């Protein structure tokens, strides 16, 4: 059966055979074990046990069980044929070369080889550890059987490893060494011969050893052959390189690979003697730290504790925890985490051991101490590769042996190489990519460095710095910026030393720079201390390794029996060898001095004993050694004596005498020993003895000064005559240098001692004397001697007589003493010169001569730099030079700090600096910058990974930070120098500020990229900020300042070309002082930006943070004065004269000047800027485009800042202008969204208007001066746009205040009357302060402002549009109301028409609106409206008017001739024009056009009884229904762009009045009811809402009377009834109202409608007219049913005449009694617990004021007819109203509910559907009435259809009290899942206030009809008064709220329905802004 083959898998072309990978897995497991063992092995002795277990596990792995893991010898011993057995195995295990890189072919041999080799080394390391840690003697330990066995195991491992790789020369050497330890000389010799005969053919030529291992092996073989005396073998050609050459000493010490093992093959065997030595107990001398210093201190402690005992002492070294060095080899291929391109055996580590196998001799110990440390050995270059065909195995494994295939073998390989192996091929490419990456990382840094140093070089050269050394140093740095090896270009020695101190950081060396700054000691002792050492090379010497050779010394001492005396002598003798060659550490020097002082006697005795036993050979080494020892001890004791005799020493006299004795004793001993030698003139020991002798003579008390001086002169002469070189004693402070120059310094010190004694006297407090003494010594170039005129004339030969004294440099006439001082200072060290400069600077500081003090600091810096370049420094050895460098670097740091402090904080620092001084100082600072730059380069390279970072320590980090701080201070100080230089040479630098700014920016970039700006407390950033703020003429200063502010405070300016970079600086808090300094620059930047852009930029955040730092301005008396005057001015009435005076700049306020810290920013407009930001925030969202009211907080904040600005600068017109804008915007916010404030809080609106107008007046007045000459005042708004905006907005404010809804109220001030004194007499009279401004004056002034605005903005159509409107209003003003002047200049019709046509011309010139935008229609509509009104007024002929309109762009037939004859044609033409404009209004924004159309069709002033009026009204109604009113009477009026805030509510009021009038004429009671319901819910949307509501209600009531023909009852129908009879009649009328006979009764229907409108009114207006209607309806009903009532009564009751006792109700008659009781009970029950159905639905916003609700109609209707408390004989009107309500409720219940049982109630769930009740509304009678039970099925259907609308339910429930006959109404409303329920008594009574307001009663439940037969119930908390004025409260539990919306509204979508919510929000009105609107003639009557 064929195998399955997937058709969607392509078969491979080359299918490799399956390979068994079991062996590979086993090899990988073994390698893991090997790596684990290797890791444990490398961890040191503490892991040796674990490493042993790991190696055991390794050798138990499967690979060591393979046949190929056995050696040839093992196979031979096993009886196998090596050749036949091996070939097939290796054929299977080793695939073709190059094919299996990581497989068994390469990994297995390597694993076997390395496992055995490293295990053998591990065994040797364990032996080494045992030897080190053992307290027994070495020989018995190494003869132990276990050690011998371990060594044999190591030898076996080495043999197996060599069987795998016989080319390992180093392994052959180790094998030979182990064999020598095991006393196998034959194996030793064989192994050494194998090591050097690997691949060399001796028959060809003599060859050199190719590696260091072979060289060592050859040298060892030569020594062994020499021991054996095998001269024949030494003649072999391969031995020639070793026989004829010697191994260098520094390599010979590394020749023995295992020096801890004894080597018996080094000498011929001798018979061993029996060891009979008996171990004796010795004292132990423990050492805590293995160092010479600790050993000396331990000796002193031992003597102090044990005394000078004679017991033997054993020195015990500490058990160090540090890991011992282990030798191991790891093939790089076995470490996948570190892939390497190299193959083969890596270089092996050669271990250096001081100890040797045999007990070291004392000479060996000394040799180990004195010999220089050997440099790291580097293997010599290997020979060229041999012939590949050579059958001899090469030492380096070939490519094939390593398993790496050639390029041509890849295709032929059977198995593809692994990814790890293939990555080796791309190593070179990766290195190249890495180099490119590093170069890209360095490129920005190098570019910044190059820019900075090139800028510095250019500036220095231009300033005249010609020092080639300085320029060369800068050139070095520039060259390094472009080089790969940047530090390789640096040649300066000081820079190299600094680089070395970083790369080889030492904590002790770094502590010099990191230590706290110590003030210089300006005393004589300090001077003497610094004067002891002269040459800078005195400290030359390499540092002594405190632990080198100590182990050998301890082993040597412990081998014999040595007391503490012997140990101390040997200790001193061993260290004296290094006295002149190495610089001892301070601890070691102290230890040696302590040992020589405490055991001086023992050392002296030991020395004398050794001197006595030594051979008296004058040229022997022993005598020379003893002479050096004696002289060294002499010098050490002399040094101790010098310190004891120091004036500051606290040693007692006994100590001084003892020290003197020691000096004398060792001086004698040294002299005696030296005399035993053959003396040479240049013998160093002799020179040292002579110098020490003279020094001791100098120290001796009582020695004459002349004698001492002669001794030094003699010594100097001797040194001059001898050929001796300079001798440096680095460990002696008394005589550190022996040379002619040092002798000269000592002589100079003696000769100048008097001068320095006077200089450093403790009581010398005269700084002037110090200046006069030191200035000639330190600065002779600046000191001149005044020569009298006579002497000057004599010198000149008398040719030029002059009376002026001359000046001569002091260098030309110096005295011998001064010359000696100069000579002394020239040879002195740097510390002394710095000390003197410091003394001079301190003296200048005391006399407050800052500039000279600053000069001293700079000279000190120059001194340090010159010393770093001196020959003494350059030719010093490394260690002392580097120590000296750190000391000078510390001094340099202190000097730079002091200099920078004076340069930045004292303006007089540079007063006396001449050009030469300036150039030299700048040159020195440039050198310092170049030197310190190496630290920055080092950090760059370590940061990006170019160089390995040193071990990170806190001290190193602190050291680098210190260098960073020095660099920052140096650049800062250099800037101050350059600034002075540039300002002194204006001819060379025409724009010095730009050059300085570029330099600062270059430094900032260099520091910022390295995150160094924060160094030195951000001193550079602070300096740069101050400098940038000072400089005025910098290009792109915002870029420089922006980065500085971001680094300092985290502020972003958001301007400029560059983006700010993160320089790693922690932002600081911005202080007030700093913020005030920034105000000028920040304000300048803000002025460059528009406010809209400013609000989006980072600069706004910066300004806010600055203001937070500045804080609020503290009030001052001056500020309070100004603010008080401003406040009083804003409250004052508007004076007409001030308006016209403002046009000429004559209005001003009384203000005083304010001088506070905030005055400076105020003058720069800071507070104005803050106010503008706050104002622009509010203006950011256009008023008319916001959907919700805006927060006025920003407005108030802006006004506050603007007022503050005006307190400081009262003449800023723009601040007044923006303050006026704030008032304007707050006014607009008050009237834009609601009409509440217009209706109730008009005083606040008047205040806003007056404040704005007053502010505009001040802005207009102060702008006059600015407009005349803009340079007079400094204005932030330097363009004229704001000025013309001010003209326009001022005009708009004036015009708006003159029109409704403000209606000239701001200009009326009748309430502000004052008393005036009569002209004649003493009386007074009261009148207003000045005349009020008329509306004509307002329009005239506004037109003038708009004309001024047109000058600046000719393309703004609003200005000419408003001019036209003003002219039209002025034209409409009746001439009789104007004065004579205004009547003469009253605008004409042509002027009005021209103004309108000008507006249309401007609009037509504007660009066409974009697609989807409507054109500007306001001017086009306005000219149609105005022309029509002119025609209607008769001021313009019809044809002329038509001609005018026909020429307009939007005429129906533009340009055509039309003929209009009469008024009808004219109206038709105007209507055509309006319709054409409406077609252009796609968005239906222009509601004025619609209303103008309707007004043309129907005039609301016409008589409604006219038949034509009804038709006209219907036509107008149809026009309005098209786009303004919906069928549910929802008015959709949108606020257009050109409509002023507040006008919308005026228009809505006018439109509602017009619609009410139209509906009244049409007798459309249903629509009128809907209109009333709409306006009742939205009282806040209508201006004069209370009057509007009263107007609508009265119209509706009148319409009800006319519709249902309800007569006005003049006579009360109930005047003949008593109260009881009235109650009985009321019950019967209520019962009759539910019968079918009552359905067609018009009075009943009218009464229901009246009750509903009364509920809707909810006491908003006086209910008199409504009550009259209800009373009349009830009376009509009574009169209608009265006959039936009488007939029924006569049938039931006997007739009794009036007054008959039997006419009274019979109490025994149960029916009569029950009727009466029922009426009384239900009435009382209703009063107590049942809320009336007439409750208030008035919303919070619709609550009228009490006084307003009591007003009568404003339409001129008569007040309700007067009535007494009772109707007729005893029936009060409230009782009639209550009975009428009961009747209406009965009708509603009968119409809405099916019959139900009295005892229970149902939810309507029975019957399968929810039956929803109907409460009757006015709409029930729309069809003329409907029977209560008619159409019950239809009602049920309607209930189901409208159930989702959350209507109310009314249900019959049983009486809670259990009484019969009582019913209560349960009103339910579903709210989501729940139901809110309330109960009301069925026979509830309703009491309404009488016309006189005697009392009010009734719950405020407003049931509004919704759709057909629907009713809405709104919840309203209320409190009613019972009759008689007694309040009657009803519980809130019975009040139920519902939505106020109709079903039609839900269908039309005009209003959203939200069940259970509060009263609905006002109708959505789309509002737009910022323009004007047209006014109609009809507005005048408002």
Swiss-Prot record:
Q: Where is the composition biased (Acidic residues)?
A: 348-365, 1832-1847, 1885-1896, 1907-1953, 1965-1982
The annotated regions of Polar residues compositional bias extend over 377-393, 1706-1715, 1732-1742
Gly residues bias: start-end ranges: 1801-1810
| A GO-annotated cellular component | nucleus
Please give the superkingdom of this protein's source: Eukaryota
| Segments passing through the bilayer | none
InterPro entries according to UniProt: Hir3/CABIN1
A biological process (GO) of this protein is: chromatin organization
Supply one GO molecular-function term: nucleosome binding
Biased segments, Basic and acidic residues type: 1688-1705, 1743-1754, 1897-1906
Q: Where in the cell is it found?
A: Nucleus
Record carries keyword 4Fe-4S = no
Task: Provide the alphabetized UniProt keywords.
Answer: Chromosome partition, Nucleus, Transcription, Transcription regulation
Ranges for region Disordered: 333-427, 1688-1776, 1791-1982
Indicate yes or no for the key word Transcription: yes
Q: Where is the composition biased (Low complexity)?
A: 1755-1765
Q: Its function? A: Has a role in a nucleosome assembly pathway that is required for the integrity of heterochromatin and proper chromosome segregation.
Q: Which family does it belong to?
A: Belongs to the HIR3 family.
Q: What is this protein called?
A: Histone transcription regulator 3 homolog
Q: Give the organism the record lists.
A: Chaetomium globosum (strain ATCC 6205 / CBS 148.51 / DSM 1962 / NBRC 6347 / NRRL 1970) (Soil fungus)
Gene designation? HIR3
């Amino acid at each position: 059966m064929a195998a399955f083959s997937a058709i969607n898998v392509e078969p491979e072309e080359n299918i490799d055979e399956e390979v068994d990978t079991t062996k590979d897995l086993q090899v990988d497991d073994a390698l893991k074990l090997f790596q684990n063992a290797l890791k444990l092995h490398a961890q040191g002795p503490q892991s040796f046990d674990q490493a042993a277990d790991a190696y055991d596990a390794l050798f138990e792995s499967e690979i060591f069980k393979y046949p190929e893991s056995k050696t040839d010898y093992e196979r031979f011993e096993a009886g196998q044929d090596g050749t036949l057995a091996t070939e097939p195995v290796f054929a299977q295990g080793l695939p073709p070369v190059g094919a299996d890189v990581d497989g068994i072919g390469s990994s297995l041999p390597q694993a076997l080889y390395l496992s055995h080799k490293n295990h053998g080394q591990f065994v040797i390391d364990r032996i080494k550890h045992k030897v080190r840690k053992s307290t027994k003697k070495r020989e018995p330990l190494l003869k132990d059987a276990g050690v011998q066995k371990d060594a044999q195991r190591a030898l076996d491992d080495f043999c197996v490893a060599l069987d795998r790789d016989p080319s390992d020369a180093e392994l052959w050497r180790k094998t030979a060494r182990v064999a020598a330890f095991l006393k196998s000389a034959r194996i030793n010799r064989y192994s050494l011969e194998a090591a050097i005969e690997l691949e060399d053919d001796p028959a060809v030529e003599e060859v050199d050893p190719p590696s260091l291992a072979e060289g060592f092996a050859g040298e060892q073989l030569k020594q062994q052959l020499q021991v054996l005396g095998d001269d024949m073998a030494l003649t072999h050609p391969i031995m020639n390189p070793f026989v004829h050459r010697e191994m260098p000493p520094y390599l010979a010490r590394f020749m023995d690979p295992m020096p801890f093992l004894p080597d018996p093959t080094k000498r011929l065997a001798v018979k061993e003697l029996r060891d009979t030595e008996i171990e004796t107990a010795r004292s132990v001398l423990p050492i805590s730290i293995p160092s010479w210093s600790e050993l000396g201190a331990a000796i002193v402690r031992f003597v102090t504790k044990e005394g000078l005992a004679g017991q033997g002492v054993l020195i015990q070294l500490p058990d160090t925890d540090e890991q011992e060095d282990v030798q191991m080899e790891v093939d790089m291929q076995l470490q996948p985490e570190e892939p390497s391109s190299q193959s083969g055996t890596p270089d092996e580590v050669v271990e250096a051991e001081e100890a040797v196998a045999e007990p070291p001799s004392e000479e060996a110990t000394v040799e180990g101490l004195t010999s220089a440390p050997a440099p790291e050995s580097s293997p010599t270059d290997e020979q060229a590769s041999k012939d590949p065909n050579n059958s001899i195995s090469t030492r380096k494994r070939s490519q094939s042996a390593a398993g790496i295939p050639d390029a041509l073998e890849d295709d032929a390989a059977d198995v593809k190489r692994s990814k790890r192996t293939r990555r080796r091929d791309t190593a070179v490419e990766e290195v190249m990519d890495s180099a490119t990456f590093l170069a890209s990382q360095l490129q920005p840094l190098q570019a910044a460095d190059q820019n900075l140093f090139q800028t510095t070089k250019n500036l220095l050269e231009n300033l005249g710095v010609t020092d080639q050394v300085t320029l060369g140093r800068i050139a070095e740095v520039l060259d390094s910026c472009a080089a790969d090896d940047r530090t390789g270009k640096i040649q300066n020695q000081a820079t190299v030393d600094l680089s070395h101190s970083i790369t080889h950081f030492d904590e002790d060396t770094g502590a010099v720079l990191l230590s706290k700054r110590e003030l210089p000691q300006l005393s004589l002792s300090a001077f003497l201390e610094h004067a002891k050492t002269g040459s800078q090379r005195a400290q030359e010497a390499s540092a002594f390794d405190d632990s080198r050779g100590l182990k050998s010394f301890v082993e040597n001492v412990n081998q014999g029996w040595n007391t503490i005396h012997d140990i101390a002598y040997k200790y001193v003798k061993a260290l004296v060898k290094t006295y002149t060659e190495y610089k001892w550490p301070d601890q070691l020097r102290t230890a040696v001095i302590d040992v020589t002082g405490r055991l001086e006697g023992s050392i002296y005795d030991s020395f004398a004993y050794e001197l006595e036993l030594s051979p008296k050979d004058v040229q022997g080494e022993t005598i020379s050694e003893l002479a050096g020892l004696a002289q060294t001890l002499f010098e050490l004791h002399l040094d101790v004596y010098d310190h004891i005799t120091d004036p500051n020493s606290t040693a007692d006299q006994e100590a001084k005498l003892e020290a003197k004795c020691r000096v004398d004793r060792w001086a004698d001993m040294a002299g005696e020993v030296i005399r035993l030698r053959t003396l040479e003139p240049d013998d160093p020991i002799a020179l040292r003895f002579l110098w020490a002798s003279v020094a001791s003579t100098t120290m001796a008390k009582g020695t004459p000064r002349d004698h001492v001086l002669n001794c030094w002169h003699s010594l100097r002469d001797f040194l001059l005559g001898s050929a001796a070189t300079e001798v440096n004693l680095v460990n002696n402070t008394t005589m550190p240098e022996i040379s002619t120059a040092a002798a000269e310094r000592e002589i100079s010190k003696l000769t100048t001692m008097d001068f320095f004694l006077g200089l450093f006297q403790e009581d010398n407090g005269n700084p002037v004397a110090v200046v006069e003494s030191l200035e000639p010594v330190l600065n002779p170039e600046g000191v001149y001697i005044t020569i009298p005129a006579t002497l000057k004339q004599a010198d000149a030969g008398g040719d030029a007589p002059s009376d002026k004294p001359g000046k001569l440099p002091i260098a030309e006439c110096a005295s011998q003493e001064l010359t000696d001082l100069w000579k002394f200072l020239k040879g002195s060290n740097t510390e002394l010169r710095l000390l003197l400069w410091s003394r001079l600077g301190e003296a200048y500081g005391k006399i407050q001569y800052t500039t000279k003090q600053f000069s001293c600091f700079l000279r000190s810096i120059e001194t340090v730099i010159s010393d770093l370049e001196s020959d003494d420094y350059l030719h010093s050895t490394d260690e002392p030079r580097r120590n000296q460098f750190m000391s000078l670097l510390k001094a340099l740091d202190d000097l730079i700090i002091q200099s920078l402090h004076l340069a930045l904080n004292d303006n007089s620092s540079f007063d006396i600096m001449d050009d030469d001084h300036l150039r030299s100082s700048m040159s020195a600072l440039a050198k310092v910058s170049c030197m310190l730059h190496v630290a920055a380069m080092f950090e760059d390279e370590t940061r990006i990974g170019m160089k390995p970072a040193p071990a990170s320590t806190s001290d190193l980090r602190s050291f680098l930070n210190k260098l960073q701080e020095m660099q920052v201070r140096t650049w800062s100080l250099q800037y101050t120098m350059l600034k002075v230089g540039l300002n002194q040479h204006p001819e060379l630098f025409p724009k010095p500020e730009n050059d300085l700014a570029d330099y600062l920016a270059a430094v900032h970039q260099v520091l910022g990229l390295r995150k160094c700006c924060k160094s030195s407390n951000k001193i550079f950033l602070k300096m740069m900020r101050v400098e940038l703020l000072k400089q005025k003429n910098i290009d792109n200063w915002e870029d420089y300042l922006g980065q500085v502010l971001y680094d300092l405070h985290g502020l972003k300016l958001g301007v400029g070309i560059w983006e700010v970079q993160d320089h790693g600086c922690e932002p600081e808090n911005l202080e007030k002082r700093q913020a005030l300094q920034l105000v000028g620059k920040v304000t300048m930047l803000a002025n460059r930006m528009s406010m809209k852009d400013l609000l989006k930029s980072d600069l706004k955040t910066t300004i806010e943070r600055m203001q937070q730092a500045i804080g609020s301005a503290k009030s001052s008396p001056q500020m309070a004065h100004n603010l008080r005057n401003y406040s009083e001015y804003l409250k004052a009435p508007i004076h007409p004269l001030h308006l016209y005076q403002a046009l000429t700049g004559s209005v001003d306020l009384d203000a005083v000047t304010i001088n506070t810290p905030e005055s400076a920013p105020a003058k720069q407009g800071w507070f104005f800027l803050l106010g503008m930001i706050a104002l622009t925030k509010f203006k950011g969202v256009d008023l008319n485009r916001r959907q919700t009211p805006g927060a006025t907080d920003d407005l108030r904040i802006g006004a506050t800042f603007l007022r503050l600005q005006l307190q400081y600068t009262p003449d800023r017109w723009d601040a007044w202008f923006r303050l006026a804008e704030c008032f304007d915007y707050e006014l607009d916010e008050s009237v834009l969204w609601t009409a509440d404030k217009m209706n109730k809080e008009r005083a606040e609106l008047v205040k806003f208007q007056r404040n704005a107008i007053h502010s505009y007046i001040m802005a207009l007045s102060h702008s006059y001066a600015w407009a005349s000459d803009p340079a007079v005042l400094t204005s932030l708004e330097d363009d004229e746009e704001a000025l013309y905006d001010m003209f326009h907005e001022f005009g708009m404010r004036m015009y708006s205040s003159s029109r409704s809804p403000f209606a000239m109220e701001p200009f009326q001030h009748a309430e502000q009357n004052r008393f005036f004194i009569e002209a004649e007499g003493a009386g007074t009279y009261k009148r207003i302060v000045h005349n009020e401004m008329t509306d004509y004056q307002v329009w005239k002034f506004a037109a003038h402002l708009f004309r001024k605005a047109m000058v600046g903005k000719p393309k703004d159509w609003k200005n000419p549009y408003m001019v036209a409107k003003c002219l039209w209003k002025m034209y409409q003003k009746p001439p009789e109301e104007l004065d004579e002047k205004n009547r003469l200049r009253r605008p004409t019709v042509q002027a009005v028409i021209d103004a309108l046509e000008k507006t249309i011309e401007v609009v037509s010139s504007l660009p066409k609106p974009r697609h989807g935008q409507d054109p500007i229609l306001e001017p086009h509509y306005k000219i149609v409206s105005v022309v029509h009104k002119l025609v209607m007024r008769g001021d313009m002929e019809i044809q002329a008017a038509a001609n005018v309109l026909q020429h307009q762009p939007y005429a129906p037939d533009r340009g055509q001739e039309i003929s209009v004859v009469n008024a009808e044609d004219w109206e038709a033409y105007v209507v055509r024009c309006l319709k054409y404009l409406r077609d252009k209004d796609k968005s239906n924004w222009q509601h004025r056009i619609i209303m103008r159309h309707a007004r043309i069709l129907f005039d609301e002033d016409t008589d409604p009884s006219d038949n034509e009026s009804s038709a006209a009204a219907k036509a107008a109604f149809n026009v309005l229904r098209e786009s303004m009113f919906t069928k549910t009477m929802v008015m959709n009026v949108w606020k257009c762009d050109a409509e002023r805030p507040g006008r919308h509510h005026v228009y809505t009021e006018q439109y509602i009045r017009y619609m009410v009038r139209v509906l009244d004429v049409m007798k459309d009671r249903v629509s009128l009811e809907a209109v009333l319901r709409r306006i009742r819910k939205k009282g806040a949307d209508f201006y004069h809402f209370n009057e509007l509501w009263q107007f609508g209600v009265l119209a509706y009531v009148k319409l009800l009377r006319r519709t249902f023909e309800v007569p006005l009852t003049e006579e009360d129908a109930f005047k003949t009834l008593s109260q009881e009879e009235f109650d009985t009649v009321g019950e019967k009328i209520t019962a009759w109202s539910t019968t079918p006979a009552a359905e067609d009764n018009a009075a009943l229907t009218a009464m229901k409608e009246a009750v509903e409108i009364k509920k809707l009114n909810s006491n908003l207006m006086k209910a008199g007219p409504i009550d009259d209607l209800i009373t009349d309806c009830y009376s009509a009903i009574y009169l209608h049913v009265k006959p039936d009532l009488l007939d029924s009564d006569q049938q039931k009751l006997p007739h009794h005449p009036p007054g008959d006792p039997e006419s009274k109700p019979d109490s025994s008659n149960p029916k009569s009694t029950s009727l009466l009781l029922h009426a009384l009970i239900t009435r009382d029950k209703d009063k107590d617990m049942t809320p009336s159905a007439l409750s208030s639905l008035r919303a919070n916003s619709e609550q009228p004021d009490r006084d307003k609700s009591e007003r009568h109609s404003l339409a001129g209707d008569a007040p309700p007819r007067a009535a007494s408390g009772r109707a007729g004989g005893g029936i009060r009107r409230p009782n009639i109203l209550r009975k009428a309500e009961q009747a209406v409720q009965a009708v509603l219940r009968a119409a809405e509910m099916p019959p139900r049982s009295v005892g229970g109630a149902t939810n309507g769930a029975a019957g399968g559907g929810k039956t929803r009740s109907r409460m009757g509304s006015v709409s029930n009678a729309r069809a003329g009435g409907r029977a209560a039970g008619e159409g019950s099925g239809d009602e049920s259907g309607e209930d189901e259809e409208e159930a989702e609308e959350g209507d109310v339910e009314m249900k019959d429930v049983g009486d809670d009290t259990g009484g019969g006959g009582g019913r209560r109404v349960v009103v339910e409303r579903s709210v989501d899942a729940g139901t809110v329920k309330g109960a009301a008594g069925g026979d509830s009574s309703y009491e309404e206030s009488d016309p006189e307001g005697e009392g009010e009663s009734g719950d405020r439940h407003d049931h509004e009809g919704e759709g057909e037969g629907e009713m809405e119930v709104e919840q309203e908390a209320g409190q009613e008064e019972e009759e008689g004025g007694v309040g009657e409260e009803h519980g809130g539990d019975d009040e139920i709220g519902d939505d106020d919306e109709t079903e039609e509204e839900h269908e039309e979508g005009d209003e959203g329905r939200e069940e259970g919510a509060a009263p609905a929000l006002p109708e959505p009105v789309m509002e737009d802004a910022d323009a004007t609107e047209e006014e109609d003639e009809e507005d005048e009557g408002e």
